[in-house]
A protein has these predicted regions:
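Extended, histidine- and acidic-residue-enriched regions that form the cofactor-binding/catalytic faces
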Residues: 1-59, 63-175
Length: 175
C-alpha cells in the first residue's frame, strides 16, 4: 500500500485492520476472531468514516480469507447507501498475484496456501529475521475448483498451513 501511495498523488492509506473473522481457524491455539457480523460492521464503519471526511473513491485490499464475505457485504451496503461513492475491492490478493506474475514464478498450487509458497516468499523477502525455513511444510488439500466447499481449517491440515512453503524464496517474494 505504501509503495502504491507513493506513486498515486493524494492517496490516503489507512492502517490495516489486524483482526477479522477467523472462526475457521478456531481449532488451532491463539486464533483471534471477530464474528462475521462484527467484522462486517467494523469494515462498514471505517468506510463510512472515510466517506464522512470527503473521500469518494475507495479501494479495499484484503489479506485474509475470512474477511472476503464481510468486505463484500460491507462494500455493497456502502454502495447502496452512498451511490455516488466509487468502491472497489481486491478481496483475494493471493489469487491475483499468482495469476498476474509470470506462470513459472510459483512451482506448486500457483503459490496459494495459508503460509504457502506465495505468502512465505513474501515473508522471506520482507521479514527474513522472523522466518524459520526449517519449519516449512507442504500440505496441498484436495479441493475442487468449481465448488466452494465450507471447511474448518483442521479438516485440511494439522499445522494450520496449506500450500508448499518448502518452495518459497525471497526472490519470489520480491516479485
Amino acid at each position: 500500500s505504501k509503495q502504491i501511495s507513493d506513486r498515486v498523488d493524494g492517496m490516503l492509506v489507512l492502517p490495516p485492520v489486524t483482526v477479522g473473522y477467523s472462526g475457521h481457524y478456531d481449532s488451532f491455539p491463539f486464533s483471534l476472531t471477530l464474528s462475521y457480523d462484527t467484522t462486517t460492521q467494523v469494515i462498514y464503519d471505517l468506510i463510512e468514516s472515510v466517506i464522512r471526511n470527503g473521500i469518494t473513491h475507495i479501494f479495499l485490499m484484503n489479506g485474509h480469507d475470512g474477511n472476503i464475505a464481510p468486505i463484500e457485504i460491507a462494500s455493497r451496503k456502502i454502495k447502496e447507501k452512498y451511490p455516488e461513492v466509487q468502491i472497489a475491492a481486491l478481496t483475494q490478493w493471493w489469487v491475483a498475484a499468482g495469476n498476474l506474475l509470470p506462470k513459472d514464478t510459483f512451482e506448486v498450487w500457483n503459490g496459494l496456501g495459508h503460509a504457502g509458497e506465495g505468502e512465505t516468499s513474501i515473508a522471506y523477502y520482507l521479514f527474513p529475521e522472523w522466518c524459520e525455513p526449517e519449519l516449512a511444510t507442504c500440505v496441498i488439500p484436495s479441493l475442487p475448483d468449481e465448488i466452494d466447499i465450507k471447511w474448518d481449517f483442521s479438516e485440511l491440515t494439522d499445522t494450520a498451513q496449506t500450500g508448499d512453503a518448502t518452495k518459497a524464496s525471497a526472490e519470489k517474494g520480491k516479485k
